[in-house]
Amino acid sequence: LYDIVGELGGIIVMEDHNFGARIYENDVTYRADPIRGLVDRYIYRMPTGKVSIARRVETVRKCITDSAAEAVVMYLKVNDIGASWEYPHIKHMLDEMKIPIIKFYDQETPMSNAYEVRTAIGTLFNQLKGGK
């Protein structure tokens, strides 16, 4: 997914679950006190699935605002039903912000539908650039 988004000119500004590449989360501050950097890293990262939906939605809102994100790609692996519960809440928030979302449910590893994913994301990016 990261390769597809990057090849299409997108930039990933947040990954909201605790699997995958942590490189997309906030970095540990290396120029400050090491303990302070670690504390900030764990306090300000995306909350795990153990917090309320409202808090998770607000964290997504803050990330979108802070990064000036123009779209959201929701990519859920097979059997990742917990994350799908927050979709209606995230969708409502994004509608208010006029931010488009594209969602992919039940995705396999490795990705078995890369062409469809690439086409859908490419279409979204084209629409963001004013294309039809």
Q: Model regions: which residues?
A:
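Redox- and metal-dependent alpha/beta enzyme cores, enriched for Fe-S-associated oxidoreductases
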Residues: 1-52, 56-59
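Hydrophobic/aromatic beta-strand patches that form the interior of the parallel beta-sheet core
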Residues: 13, 72-73, 102
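A short, acidic, amphipathic alpha-helical segment used as a generic capping/interface helix at domain edges
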Residues: 51-68, 85-86
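Peripheral docking tails and interdomain loops at the edges
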Residues: 88-132
